[in-house]
């Protein structure tokens, strides 16, 4: 969601409005009991060394991963913290589709970058679990519509589709999967070999 918000002004405004509403609702709540050591904890946090602007800029610099510098500079800054510490291993799933799993320490979901070459198509597939996708670069279409940079979509079991990148450029997406995809048609014989890499 944070990645989508980086692309969508309207959604950022909506989140800001919801944060303001939440603050207003908190002012109407009854006072809560506070722990005896809350003041000491707060003062300790205030005394802790603060990160400087240079530290923040360094943390958000272009990731030092196996992404090409051109693509890395276009990724949302939120993703840089995951990509700075690892080499991405791109695997070819078809002649026009590659995937690179991103290790985030999660065991129930896989976070990955998917790249469909310009004019390329992913195999027709269903979903064994939930798939959340944000388009980071380029665009693709499927049976339900066209998705451009910043667009967010969700697929569930029974949602069969075949993403196709536009002819003018490759499409890079960030996806979160709760289970591997399920190939359909003649390629379904490959399903036992589909890897799922939550980490």
For the regions a language model picked out, list residue spans one by one.
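Short acidic-glycine-tyrosine-enriched beta hairpin
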Residues: 142-162
